[in-house]
Structure formats: structure tokens, C-alpha cells
């Protein structure tokens, strides 16, 4: 699974062009999903572009409102996402945890809303810079992962993104990534009997470090931000998977 998270970047034309170019450049592998998460206002346009050329790219949302309907200006709910045939949704990204004060209770409501609607979840976790030692990191991640208790993990992918590595150019290092991904998989198996839990890595992923990260048996894919906006760079990273 290789995911392009556009955040609040790009225009409709940029995204349509990206879909066309990536669809031509990637050496699509049935077992490696290629996902674009554009801004919500471009979900419909992205879906139309994907369908028009019968692209293997799958569509993801950056957000989901926990209720089916309600008074949340700017919200987007599961029914709306299904109208665009949205296959994935990001939940728990550190930027939303930080800037929108999202906690475990609201994240669980979003999680349930997505699963009930048949939308696969990419659940994001990660530690801040003051918790970079292994024990503090693991304790923090356990708390974040507690949201998944009593949940069928079959439609959930974990995205490990250390907060201090997002958009900073700092990479966690392959030994740290392998250690934390292994910990996540072992810990989740204590919450659920699903033995095929996928864990992808995010945080300053670039073309020059992606091959090493993907070479780890504990890494099942990548969640890429800024580097993914360039179709050529993203396609080259995907083709390494």
C-alpha cells in the first residue's frame, strides 16, 4: 500500500493530471494498492478521473465526520464518501489530533462510522519529539492503539508517523522503524486475533530513503506527504514496492 496524502495542496487540474500521469507510470501490482487522498472538495473530481481511464488508483479521504448527519460546518460523513465510492479514509492524523484536539473518544466514533459504511481505515499514530526513546514511544502508541480494542482489524491499516519526522526532513531511521512496526504488530495481536495486520510508515518519506524503508519485512507500505505531489517521484517510489 502506497498512499499519497495531498493535505491542503493542489488544484482540481493538478489532481486530474496526477492521476493520469501516475496511472501511466506505475508498474501496477495487484497486491500493492495505490491510493490518493486529495482534499475533500476534489474527491468527486478525482473519482471521475479514476473511472474515466479505468485507473487502478484507489480513492481515499482525509477526513470523516463521526455522525451520519448533523450540525458540523465543513464536515463530510460516511454517506457522502460512499457517494464518491471512496475506498479509504485517514483517521487520527497527527495534524488533526494537534490542531483539532481529536482524542480517543472522537476517533473511535469516526472509526465505527467508517467501518459501518464499508470504508477501509488508515489509522494514524505517532509520538512527539519528547517521547523519542523506545519506552516512552511504546507507551504513547499503546494509548493511541487502545481505540482499536474490540474492533475487527480486517479493514484497518496502521500508519506509523512519528510526529517529529512529519515535514521536517528528519527520518526515523530503519532500525527504529523496524522496532516500532514489530511492536505495533505484536501489541495489536493481543487485542485481536487478526494475524495479517498491515503497518505502513510515514514521516519525511522521499525517493532517496523509500527503498531502504520498504526493504524491511515489518513495513507494509508508505504514507507519503509532500514528496508524493510530484507524479514522477511518487511513481518511482511506488515501483520500488
Question: Where in this protein do the model-derived segments appear?
Answer:
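Active-site loop-to-helix "anion-binding N-cap" substructures in soluble metabolic enzymes
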Residues: 1-241
Amino acid at each position: 500500500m502506497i498512499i499519497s496524502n495531498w493535505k491542503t495542496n493542489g488544484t482540481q487540474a493538478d489532481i486530474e493530471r496526477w492521476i493520469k500521469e501516475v496511472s501511466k507510470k506505475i508498474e501496477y501490482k495487484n497486491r500493492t494498492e495505490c491510493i490518493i487522498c486529495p482534499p475533500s472538495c476534489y474527491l468527486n473530481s478525482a473519482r471521475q478521473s479514476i473511472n474515466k481511464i479505468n485507473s487502478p488508483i484507489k480513492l481515499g479521504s482525509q477526513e470523516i465526520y463521526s455522525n451520519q448527519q448533523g450540525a458540523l460546518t465543513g464536515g463530510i460523513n460516511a454517506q457522502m464518501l460512499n457517494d464518491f465510492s471512496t475506498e479509504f479514509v485517514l483517521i487520527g492524523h497527527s495534524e488533526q489530533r494537534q490542531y483539532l484536539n481529536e482524542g480517543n473518544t472522537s476517533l473511535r466514533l469516526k472509526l465505527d462510522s467508517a467501518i459501518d459504511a464499508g470504508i477501509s481505515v488508515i489509522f494514524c499514530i505517532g509520538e512527539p519529539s519528547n517521547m523519542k526513546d523506545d519506552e516512552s514511544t511504546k507507551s504513547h502508541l499503546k494509548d493511541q492503539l487502545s481505540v482499536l480494542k474490540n474492533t475487527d482489524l480486517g479493514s484497518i491499516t496502521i500508519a506509523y508517523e512519528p510526529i517529529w519526522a512529519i515535514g521536517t526532513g528528519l527520518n526515523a531511521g530503519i532500525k527504529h522503524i523496524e522496532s516500532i512496526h514489530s511492536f505495533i504488530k505484536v501489541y495489536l495481536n493481543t487485542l485481536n486475533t487478526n494475524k495479517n495486520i498491515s503497518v505502513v510508515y510515514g514521516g519525511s518519506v522521499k525517493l532517496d530513503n523509500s527503498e531502504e524503508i520498504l526493504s524491511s519485512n515489518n513495513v507494509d507500505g508508505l504514507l507519503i506527504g509532500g514528496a508524493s505531489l510530484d507524479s514522477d517521484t511518487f511513481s518511482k517510489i511506488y515501483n520500488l514496492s
